[in-house]
């Protein structure tokens, strides 16, 4: 193997440095010390579903088309997958140069496209995904004694020990699958990603022992991969960093409602709540206006008026282990009654998904039932931007480092799919929520948040450790990896090879021509996103 790329979700120096000092991750510590390492600036927004495609294509979301865990068609939505990534991935570029690849567990790679090599998909794939080549998953399971995309028991009730065991088992499966496939296919390029280094901060965020265990398991697998695959060059990268919140929860749709931009409903026409994601049966359903509300519906309606919506009720029930029991007996219509949400068709502007970090205008002729006239678009958007730039926390601090029109952040053929206004929270210390809970500010629902800076490191052949990483950006990873293999970067790439490798120049590659987007088929993916706080 000539080049190995190791992806470690959410890895950053505030997390790694204490682990290095404690001797918990000796393999990573040695790689960082023997080669070159530094901060890697992530993109906007710095979240898994968009950032990993940016890393493995070298282009911004406006060029590859994925901005969120969700993709939208008018007011309807689906979970993103690889068919929504409309640019060539690293392994597809290498295929066109006659080089083979093995790719394991990289997010947003299902369903795989044809290339020379092997691919087992990662996050956002269903549990039994199609792999490349066909039948590969069965071979992997037979070879290593089982394989799952997600940690065993992830959707069931687990205690701390079982959760940590799940992290270890997930790391083992990634490492053993990668080594088996590398031995079988003998690729020039290998890419393996470890996801639970992020998940641990959502599930056990204050548990230093759990964090150490998750990273130690990954470090052990990296060591085994290096020993068995003996790559000439190793690159390590993350999609973003992670850290504690030090601010507030800012409820964007509450802000918009209070200023007359957003209208609300307790029926359909919006994103699903906690309850509907778990039940997997409310997409854009319409409320039945002719039916008499049940006593439970009326009670939940009253609760919603004082801020107890089903989203937070779901979190409270889950905390005491009653969420599944409640969902078994609470009728769908009662859930709808207790879920106050933005009505997309009736609103001028709304946050459709918190992971998107932005606001979408409901424009006539663009959205199915748009209310903002095209000639008013610029004025409405500028007014929104000015108002949001002035928002202050209860402590008098600015909520946002920047509030920008989308074209100031993204460029490319898919900018039209992005939010119209992009929000950059101050130091990413504020939790942006799409929920309607009465007050614009509250305590963050989660203790940790993605941060703007991850890591990049490299060691081995062709790496000039004295050159440093410069102002390394997420978009630079793909052209850097190509340079280690002597392959020119695509002219469409927004990144450039980092200073520690010798650039090979650029080349015009064929335009991307993909198949129509595939619909998500495993609603357990939605539940996982909901459990992690990515869907509210």
Positions of the model-derived regions?
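Low-complexity, glycine/alanine/valine/leucine- and proline-rich hydrophobic stretches
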Residues: 424, 429-478, 482-486
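A long, amphipathic alpha-helix that forms part
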Residues: 15, 163-190, 195-236, 240-244, ...
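Polar, surface-exposed loop/tail segments
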Residues: 395-418, 469, 486-517
